[in-house]
Design a protein with these regions (language model features):
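Active-site SXXK
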Residues: 63, 75-108, 138, 271
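Structured C-terminal helix/loop/strand segments within mature extracytoplasmic catalytic/sensor domains
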Residues: 3-22, 37-45, 152-153, 157, ...
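Sec/Tat-exported extracytoplasmic proteins
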Residues: 46-49, 86-96, 107-109, 139-142, ...
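Beta-lactamase-like hydrolase cores
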Residues: 31-72
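Conserved catalytic neighborhood of penicillin-recognizing serine enzymes
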Residues: 110-148, 157
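Extracytoplasmic
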Residues: 50-52, 69-71, 79, 98-100, ...
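Mid-domain, small-residue-enriched loop/turn segments at the edges of structured enzyme/sensor domains
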Residues: 52, 127, 148-207
Length: 301
């Protein structure tokens, strides 16, 4: 073999490998920051509670991501209500409904004194609320009565599942109304999503073209006005960020917070986090969501 050719071969091989690595660099940079081992705060939650936490977060401008159990199923609890409002708004966009139309409301829609329906309870004497008012109550206040009445209006849990399928989510499913949708038996796929799938829904509904600009503005406004998120992601996200979120919890072992947040105008970050299982206390759940918020602020801002 010619010595000159022998010397060239390794150099050419190096050049090819270098070009391949450079070409792959954007994809490598977009991989989750902790795909195999969770950060200490998440590991501690799973160890101390016996439950699990799932996270998917992505800066849509830089492509940077954080993920842990991002493709595992978690019970949604009330976080489904943001998608429910999106379905209502899609129907409005198609002329099938109107935000000003009234939905009847009566004492029979509040089954017990401890039933969580703050807006419905305040308005029982009126006998009705508008579609827009019920959407705002369901998303901003997590009102269960308003959510159930809206579900009935759009065709029930199966209709919401069909909406997810039609708009690109092949994972998320709703099988029950409130309060049955909050059950969390291990391994049961009913009423569940994954952090990654729900982040995709937020991207399509809040930032994408599934809804008209005015409908996106309505949905974002209701999420910006979230009244139930102080002890969730908002507990750790930078206070200067714009935060639009929807929470959920079953009062036992499951909770979630899904959000679109903006560190700066025009720089959206998706954050979807869920916990389920084990025996967590309220303080442990609040603490780990705050930890996730801080992590997102430090790594994806």
């Amino acid at each position: 073999m010619n010595d000159r050719h022998a010397r060239r071969a390794p150099l050419e091989g190096f050049a090819l490998r270098r070009r391949a690595l450079l070409a792959a660099a954007p994809a490598l940079a977009a991989w989750p920051a902790f795909a195999q081992t969770p950060p200490p705060a998440l590991a501690a939650y799973e160890r101390d509670t016996g439950g699990k936490i799932g996270l998917y977060a992505e800066n849509l401008t830089t492509g940077a991501k954080l993920a842990w159990r991002a493709d595992e199923r978690f019970v949604m609890c009330s976080s489904f209500k943001a998608s429910l409002a999106a379905l209502v708004l899609a129907r409005v966009d198609r002329g099938q409904d109107g935000l000003e139309r009234l939905i009847a409301l009566g004492p029979w829609d509040v089954p017990s004194d401890d039933w969580y329906a703050p807006i419905a309870k305040q308005n029982l004497a009126k006998g009705a609320l508008s579609v827009a008012e019920m959407c705002g109550a369901a998303v901003s206040y997590s009102d269960n009565t308003c959510a159930n009445l809206l579900l009935a209006r759009v065709g029930g849990p199966a209709a919401l599942t069909a909406f997810w399928r039609a708009t690109g989510d092949g994972v998320t499913r709703l099988d029950h109304n409130e309060p049955m949708l909050n059950r969390s038996p291990p391994g049961d796929p009913q009423d569940t999503t994954t952090p990654r799938a729900m982040a995709g829904n937020l991207r399509r509904f809040v930032l994408g073209k599934v809804l008209s600009p005015s409908s996106r503005e309505h949905l974002t406004g209701w999420m910006l006005n979230c009244q139930t998120g102080a002890n969730r992601l908002r507990g750790g996200l930078p206070t200067t960020w714009r935060i639009a979120d929807k929470t959920g919890n079953n009062g036992k072992d499951a909770a979630g917070d899904i959000a679109v947040v903006w560190p700066r105008p025009g720089v959206p970050v998706l954050v979807c986090a869920y916990v389920q299982g084990g025996s967590p206390g309220d303080a442990q759940i609040a603490s780990v969501f705050a930890d996730v918020g801080r992590m997102v602020g430090q790594r994806l801002g």
